[in-house]
Amino acid sequence: MTNLTLALDAMGGDHGPHVTVPAALRALQLHSFLKIILVGDKTEIDVYLRQAEANLLSRIEIIHTDEVVSMSDRPVHALRTRKNSSMRLAIELVRDDCAQACVSAGNTGALMAMAKVLLKTLPGVDRPALVSCLPAVTQKPVYLLDLGANISCDSETLFQFAVMGSVLCEAVDKKSRPKVALLNVGIEEIKGNDQVQQAAQLLQHTDQINYTGFIEGDEIYSGNVDVIVCDGFVGNITLKTSEGIAKLLVHQLKRGLTQGLFVRFLAKLIAPRIQAVLSQMNPDHYNGASLIGLRGIVVKSHGNADETAYLQAISLAVTEAQRRLPEMIKDRLESILLDINH
């Protein structure tokens, strides 16, 4: 396997090095070809490296900085003033080809702003999109984009999102011709606003995207499609609502299984199965949102991710780097534009 280097914003997120460094060590154990650059306060990072094995330490580099982008920093402010922050330096390592991807659990708005300015978008891409996968009843992931990078989008941007989401699904899941749908208020062709209607027209006229039509919100988790496209306003609300419902279901299930002696006894008998179901619904299992459409790979972890969840984000970055995702998106867009022009 070709060696890969990842840059980690070690200070990002609610827990900083307490989570990012142990997760990095676990990633190195899993991937013998991997090298990791930890960007952040060396004194804090070293605390979590004291007991690490020598063969793992040999594949770790630390770039020291004591500047951090806070969760309260506005994106423009962070972009202008946090020029030596752990987040920015990690992205710059990707820009300068010192790393093939970067991962951060820090301020989402600042991460998107810095990544777009420092890495630039790919040719044929107007705006990058934030995408993540969701669970489905078929036990295969469903990719949803955009999750908030772009509050409003025109039809051309939605079309580009569909292309990028399709390529991502092919790259990460090795799925041939993934099914792509536009999230809408109905499945009928007459439904939806102008942007969605026009995006549908664009998608219907390219054979390189397996476009299946509109999909409604109640079908998101059906597994009938592989990629669901919408603007960032709709996508972010959809994601947050889904996470809230998952928490509600877990709460109600736990409360229901502790009421009454017989129910508690029954709960103990089926506890392993319940735990397996709850694990599938846990957002940490799907941690890692990709900012796609850029000339480099950037993965956003949940800010409150634990070690296992952060490891999932690292693994996603590794997979995207192995598949050379930006190059795949660039090639597909060029091919589609060539078909349209002919």
From Swiss-Prot:
Q: Which GO terms describe its molecular function?
A: phosphate:acyl-[acyl carrier protein] acyltransferase activity
The alphabetical list of record keywords is: Cytoplasm, Lipid biosynthesis, Lipid metabolism, Phospholipid biosynthesis, Phospholipid metabolism, Transferase
Where's it found, cell-wise?
Cytoplasm
Q: What is its EC number?
A: 2.3.1.274
Name the source's superkingdom. Bacteria
One GO biological process this protein is involved in is: phospholipid biosynthetic process
Function, in words:
Catalyzes the reversible formation of acyl-phosphate (acyl-PO(4)) from acyl-[acyl-carrier-protein] (acyl-ACP). This enzyme utilizes acyl-ACP as fatty acyl donor, but not acyl-CoA.
Which PANTHER family would you find in this protein's record?
A: FATTY ACID/PHOSPHOLIPID SYNTHESIS PROTEIN PLSX, PHOSPHATE ACYLTRANSFERASE
What interactions and quaternary structure are annotated? Homodimer. Probably interacts with PlsY.
The family annotation for this protein states: Belongs to the PlsX family.
Protein name per the record: Phosphate acyltransferase
Source organism of the structure: Shewanella baltica (strain OS223)
